[in-house]
Amino acid sequence: MKVSRRKFIKAQAVASAAAAAGISIPISASNVVTDSSLTKITWEKAPCRFCGTGCSVNVGTKEGKVVATHGDIKSPVNRGLNCVKGYFLSKIMYGKDRLTQPLLRMTDGKFDKNGEFSPISWDQAFDIMAEKWKKTLKEKGPEAIGMFGSGQWTIYDGYAASKLMKAGFRSNNLEPNARHCMASAVVGFIRTFGIDEPMGCYDDIEAADAFVLWGSNMVEMHPILWTRVTDRRLSVPGVKVSVLSTFEHRSFELADIPIIFTPQSDLAILNFIANYIITNDKVNKDFTSKHVNFRRGTTDIGYGLRPEHPLQQAAKNPDSGDSTPMTFEEFKAFVSEYTVEKASEISGVKPDKLIELAELYANPETKVVSFWTMGFNQHTRGVWCNNLVYNIHLLTGKISTPGNSPFSLTGQPSACGTAREVGTFAHRLPADLVVTNPEHRKIAEKIWKLPDGTIPGKVGAHAVLQSRMLKDGKINAYWIQVNNNLQAGANINEETLPGYRNPDNFIVVSEAYPTVTSQAADLVLPTAMWVEKEGGFGNAERRTQLWHQMVEAPGESKPDLWQLMEFSKRFKTDEVWPKELLDSNPDYKGKTLFDVLFINGNVNKYPLDDLAEGTLNDESNYYGFYVHKGLFEEYAEFGRGHGHDLAPFDMYHETRGLRWPVVDGKETLWRYREGSDPYVKEGAGFEFYGKPDGKAIIFALPYEPAAESPDEEYDMWLSTGRVIEHWHSGSMTQRVPELYKAYPDAQVFMHPDDAKSRGLRRGDAVKVMSRRGEIITRVETRGRNKPPIGLVFVPWFDASQLINKVTLDATDPLSKQTDFKKCAVKIVKA
């Protein structure tokens, strides 16, 4: 069968359009792209490597390389579409400067922290790592080692890292970079519902009458979901979109209710909406009386800075997440002070706009989806913002039904599936278990076949605290995988770089390319990427997706999972576990951590025969058993029967993912609702079963100011973020020629009047300066981002312009998530 280029392109367009419309796909269109008889290309499915949307792509390989990708028509998430980054997935692994062998800083053949990077073998790399880890463990104990992972870790990577750190090394100093992006969402879910992750799903988009974006530029950060929102808005009369942000961006192009507000004032707007609902008698009293409790939150909780910082010293209740019961009438009185006039004064938004927004929520006939990402979460009161938007949905009963959903969008491909569900945070274990709960630790120890008391009960150091402890010499052995924290962390010159270069510390970075972080490391380990290994991600709608390895990694690059497992062989329990633990459990004496953690009868349970025929799998072939299946099935034990049920491993390779809980082979679209969620009891209607009484909580939480605001010297707000062309720090996308050319350099976006008043013109070189640092960049007064007077926006993908030299390392005191959206700067001509 021969197909012309014209017919090929036409068929592909027909297929995508048909899938987007939800109609059947012509056979010729559905098969033409992946018909290997035409191209000699082998096609397999995998989730996209980039954001948390969880698009599925078809990956084409030929002669051992990924040569093409296209949107997976069979995927219910993206329906054959890709964003601009997704279209160039095939190129992310083939940058000219790909790392292919371990590199150690050396002088005259020996390790030297100030030496030059020199190639070494994997054995040599693990030898020096083990030497440094053992020295640190012996001298200072497990709290002096740490690991910083990622929401881009596969499920297997994160799970193995958690076992190695929390059970093997008995240290809870394990964190993902998702601390920077999703931690406030997590704590918000836990406080309100007692269980993590959204109750709704993407199907809500096709059922909603209104969409409200709180600090979310979906058109650039979640473009495939935005196509679905756009389709709903343009094809169904009466559907409305409201976009709230501190500056105008591309999502405003579709906004019926555009709102630009003063940074931090979203707290006041949210409380006003609750007040509006109550004063206009729009509370769903039947729902709230049956399914809601009210509590007053502790206030004046500080800003997550170092204890000696004046703002921390001044806080009355630093880091407190406590709350006390209150009645509906008391809650009504609390929000009554948030009148439209007060909210307008604090936010700078005209009263009529605020009322128009509030009416979307108040009207019982309007089904509303609230979307948010970093604008809410990267916020010194991010947890409160999450709680307050839930207040609105709970007051109106607009929750857990099709088209009614408060929906926290995820930034990374497995911030949900790995960081949150696997539990790679310093306080967590899988399936919402926590290290501070003795019963939870016992569950983990039983599943992992470990002695009672193996897992420590003390919460480890969170991401920002890890950087501070490295600087202060309290963490001395540190392993970083799948992130670029020296570019991505806040206040990097003062709080991050000093710890990496502290002569008492040994820093290991597993990376695919040279980055700002790897340049500051002592040892760099070359890492396999994406489909160079078998993997699994979990997206924002609780959809777990797995993929097979499709190509080999270049040179000596190895999967992160292999690195973790192989490193565990270098330690015996006698070297890392306390004597009393081993004396009471002598069967564990003399065993390696590899034996204890990965040859435990669970992980090594499945033979190589279980591998799909013709499938590559470097780790499994190396170890002689199906590593990934064993890890997955052991991990799944945590959630089955506890509201986090995963399907059997093989089922995921037969589908485009499943949304948990998966019970009796059926996924769950809407949690907490009878008839949709198998955990809701018959007759309950709704049941928020993460709480002991099955009721969600509405919190009374006030507006409180930002940690740092503009003043006479530093007279402008700075907000940072991303652009559609680049992923996070740009270490992958800047190596794709088409994406680099589309957006090669960062700029400072500012209002034309602000530029004019400073004698600046578009294209001028300027310094963006804060109390902490400065960068040189160029002025942009046009284009996609249009800040109001008094605010500037700088994207952070550009390693030549490290804007996080400038940002403040203030965090939400409850979630420990950094606020990258608000600090004070000045702009001066360079």
Swiss-Prot record:
UniProt-listed Pfam families: Molybdop_Fe4S4, Molybdopterin, Molydop_binding
EC number: 1.9.6.1
Any one GO molecular-function label of the UniProt entry: 4 iron, 4 sulfur cluster binding
CDD domains found in the cross-reference section: MopB_CT_Nitrate-R-NapA-like, MopB_Nitrate-R-NapA-like
Enzymatic class: oxidoreductase
Gene: napA2
Role: Catalytic subunit of the periplasmic nitrate reductase complex NapAB. Receives electrons from NapB and catalyzes the reduction of nitrate to nitrite.
Subunit (UniProt): Component of the periplasmic nitrate reductase NapAB complex composed of NapA and NapB.
Residues binding substrate, per UniProt: 796
GO process annotations (BP): cellular respiration; Mo-molybdopterin cofactor biosynthetic process; nitrate assimilation
Entry note: cofactor: Binds 1 [4Fe-4S] cluster. Binds 1 molybdenum-bis(molybdopterin guanine dinucleotide) (Mo-bis-MGD) cofactor per subunit.
Residues at which [4Fe-4S] cluster binds: 48, 51, 55, 83
Domain of life: Bacteria
HAMAP family, per the entry: Nitrate_reduct_NapA (MF_01630)
All residue ranges annotated as the 4Fe-4S Mo/W bis-MGD-type domain in the record: 41-97
Similarity comment: family membership: Belongs to the prokaryotic molybdopterin-containing oxidoreductase family. NasA/NapA/NarB subfamily.
Catalyzed reactions: 2 Fe(II)-[cytochrome] + nitrate + 2 H(+) = 2 Fe(III)-[cytochrome] + nitrite + H2O
Residues that hold Mo-bis(molybdopterin guanine dinucleotide) according to the record: 85, 152, 177, 181, 245-249, 264-266, 374, 378, 484, 510-511, 533, 560, 720-729, 804, 821
Official protein name in the record: Periplasmic nitrate reductase 2
GO CC annotations on file: membrane; nitrate reductase complex; periplasmic space
